[in-house]
């Protein structure tokens, strides 16, 4: 079955963040600034890790992938979002499904990249003598490969459940991107199976990743509290603290968004709440990790010296 046959709608209209004309330019400038910071921050961190052999460690391998994912999923919808502020907000059916797939792929993958990073911190703090043996290149590769496989499977499930729906009455998406819940509201056929797929996939991915991270955190915290010296505890907390902040921002804002949009008539609130985890979190992650890390600052200093001198 072709995409055209699966739906009588050939294009969608994205409502965007606001329908007030006087807000379009300020919002365009605001999100352009956020997008520039996101691209520069994540691309800069990717480059810094790539060209500095001293940063070729398991922790920075995971951080490299986190920055890559943040950069990619921000690029999936932000350019279209910026264009919609200054022109007609139309996206084709194929374009909408493509955007949905890649958005779900990168968001789902990030959940398990954060799990891998939590496991990495657990091994580093709780079993430091076995760290390089446990976190071998093969293990790191398998953890990342598994993260992307989970992301791909989740994206296929979400997109496949949308492709089976028929959109015939309305083509106005009450959002600034093609997401599952706003699309479900437009279907003129039964959405029972698609809703079931959505809640199973989101529930499994969120619950498994959250439980894994919480267990890692509990073990890390119990180990840190057993460190006799205040200096040792402070160092352990500093390496662990940035990851806590990133995880709390990502899972907290994402969970709040989907809980908000699950209630009838609350899509408008969810639209604004989703800005935080789709736009703000990818912008903040490079700062959260690099500004608190001495290795990053040292590597940046060496890189700037090589470039300038």
From Swiss-Prot:
It is a multi-pass membrane protein. Disulfide bonds join 96-188. It holds the Pfam family 7tm_4. One of its GO terms (molecular function) is odorant binding. The keyword Ubl conjugation does not apply. Residues 1-25, 76-98, 160-196, 258-270 are extracellular. CDD domains: 7tmA_OR8B-like (cd15405). Its main location: membrane. It is found in: Cell membrane. GO terms for biological process: G protein-coupled receptor signaling pathway; sensory perception of smell. The chain crosses the membrane at residues 26-46, 55-75, 99-119, 139-159, 197-216, 237-257, 271-291. Keywords: Cell membrane, Disulfide bond, G-protein coupled receptor, Glycoprotein, Membrane, Olfaction, Receptor, Sensory transduction, Transducer, Transmembrane, Transmembrane helix. The keyword DNA damage does not apply. Residues 47-54, 120-138, 217-236, 292-309 are cytoplasmic. Belongs to the G-protein coupled receptor 1 family. PANTHER family: OLFACTORY RECEPTOR. Odorant receptor. This is Olfactory receptor 8B4.
